[in-house]
């Protein structure tokens, strides 16, 4: 049976941990707001480029970009986005589970897999699963990621696609729905399919390209793919901070519950000890 001193020390220890979890909750809340701002700022840019690409894809260009052409799938590549730090609930585990299920589906079709990984958690995980799948990785991008940190990793996979070593490219990350909800999501990046509706087709008009449609399309498609990956990174960052904030709040609340239970136990121990001492005093006086 625990002594009164041990229970008191345990309560104090939990109190100290609770202070840390509350501090981490507040830090995560602040970082989440910053990540949300980044996410909202980058969205219009990505959507605007996508509209232009959809419009161009409906045009009658002599030049047909490799990113717009479908082909037989023999190898699939993924940009995998995870966090560098833990204490974020099941955020990374959910992404890994979804990706492993998708990889299993492709393996049944004898399709090879290549991964470009962002975040140390995914790097560690897939190094244990199969290091041969990893072709590129980056970690330590911080709380305010920059496009320049991702260019090399994005370019590696695009080069493999252009060389025919990868036939389809996907992006997997945690999509930020709201503070309480983040869901793992896989989206196809290449080949690019038009999202235009019938109205766009019937009311189609074409651009005049200067100096050349090939130069424009090459640049535009690369910028679009880079912005898609960046958007995934900032959404995953917002999801990470949100999940960490919720996890730390849950830890603080659980700590409070444990402290209440320990206080009840502590009071019972004290009551038992006082009762025992009184009984000893009474029995001692009766002997006298």
From Swiss-Prot:
A GO biological-process term: proton motive force-driven plasma membrane ATP synthesis
GO MF, one example: proton-transporting ATP synthase activity, rotational mechanism
Compartments it resides in: Cell inner membrane
Keywords assigned by UniProt, alphabetized: ATP synthesis, Cell inner membrane, Cell membrane, CF(1), Hydrogen ion transport, Ion transport, Membrane, Transport
Protein's UniProt keywords contain Transport: yes
Superkingdom of the organism of origin: Bacteria
CDD domains, alphabetized: F1-ATPase_gamma
Listed name of the protein: ATP synthase gamma chain
Organism of provenance: Blochmanniella floridana
Gene this chain is encoded by: atpG
């Amino acid at each position: 049976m625990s002594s009164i001193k041990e229970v008191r020390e345990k309560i104090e220890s939990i109190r100290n941990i609770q202070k840390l979890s509350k501090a981490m909750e507040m830090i995560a809340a602040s970082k989440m707001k910053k990540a949300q701002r980044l996410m909202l700022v980058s969205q219009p840019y990505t959507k605007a480029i996508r509209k232009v690409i959809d419009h161009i894809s409906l045009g009658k260009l002599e030049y047909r970009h490799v990113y717009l052409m479908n082909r037989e799938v023999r190898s699939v590549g993924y940009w995998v986005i995870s966090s560098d730090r833990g204490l974020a609930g099941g955020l990374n585990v959910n992404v890994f589970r979804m990706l492993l299920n998708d990889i299993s589906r492709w393996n049944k079709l004898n399709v090879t897999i290549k991964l470009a990984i962002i975040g140390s958690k995914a790097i560690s995980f897939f190094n244990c699963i199969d290091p041969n799948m990893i072709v590129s990785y980056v970690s330590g991008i911080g709380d305010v990621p920059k496009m320049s940190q991702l260019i090399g990793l994005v370019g590696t996979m695009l080069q493999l696609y252009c060389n025919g070593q990868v036939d389809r490219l996907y992006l997997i990350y945690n999509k930020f729905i709201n503070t309480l909800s983040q869901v793992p999501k896989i989206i196809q990046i290449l080949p690019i399919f038009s999202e235009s509706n019938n109205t766009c087709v019937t009311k189609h008009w074409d651009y005049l390209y200067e100096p050349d449609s090939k130069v424009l399309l090459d640049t535009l498609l690369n910028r679009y793919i880079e912005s898609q990956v960046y958007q995934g990174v900032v959404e995953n960052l917002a999801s990470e901070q949100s999940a960490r904030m919720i996890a730390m709040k849950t830890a603080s609340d659980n700590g409070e519950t444990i402290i209440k239970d320990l206080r009840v136990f502590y009071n019972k121990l004290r009551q038992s000890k006082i009762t025992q001492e009184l009984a000893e005093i009474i029995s001692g006086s009766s002997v006298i």
